Amino acid sequence: MKILALEPYFGGSHKAFLDGWSARSQHEWEMIGLPAYKWKWRMRHAAITMADDVAARIGEGATWDALFCSDMLNLAELLGLVPEAVRRLPAVVYFHENQLTYPAAAETDRDLHFAFTNLTTALAADSVWFNSKYH
């Protein structure tokens, strides 16, 4: 099985998770990642940036059997921007953490826009996985 993995924050524990899993997997993984920098900016623009990259790879003949992404990607936006071949793939989203339950410095600091992005991502996915019962 060929899996397209999209990680907008490809660093730290996000990178360690994907690198570890893909290295031990029997499947073929193709990673598209963005540097681990300014997570809010990554959540805002990753779908646009990654959709362009995905389209370019399809133009070069790439195909996949499944799509895997983390909670840092707005999957609903991405699916609206990619070619139909990608929209038809079964999509799994992995919540490494989520912005609804992630501890905020103060409740007044919580930006619910990012929690809503996580919600729309979950609704757009065929399967939703969490790293713990907490998240």
Language-model regions, residue ranges each:
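N-terminal subdomain of nucleotide-sugar transferases
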Residues: 1-38, 44-64
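Short N-terminal targeting/anchoring amphipathic segment
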Residues: 4, 55-77, 94, 127-129
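Short glycine-/acidic-enriched loop or helix-start segments at secondary-structure transitions
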Residues: 15-16, 76-80, 103-104
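Short, well-ordered alpha-helix to beta-strand connector turns
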Residues: 25-26, 64, 88-89, 125-126
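Short, conserved loop/helix-junction motifs that constitute active-site signature segments
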Residues: 82-88, 121-124
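Acceptor-binding helix/loop patch of EC 2.4 sugar-transfer enzymes
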Residues: 89, 93-116
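Membrane-proximal helix-turn-helix segments that form the acceptor-binding/catalytic region
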Residues: 111-128
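Carbohydrate-associated surface elements
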Residues: 134
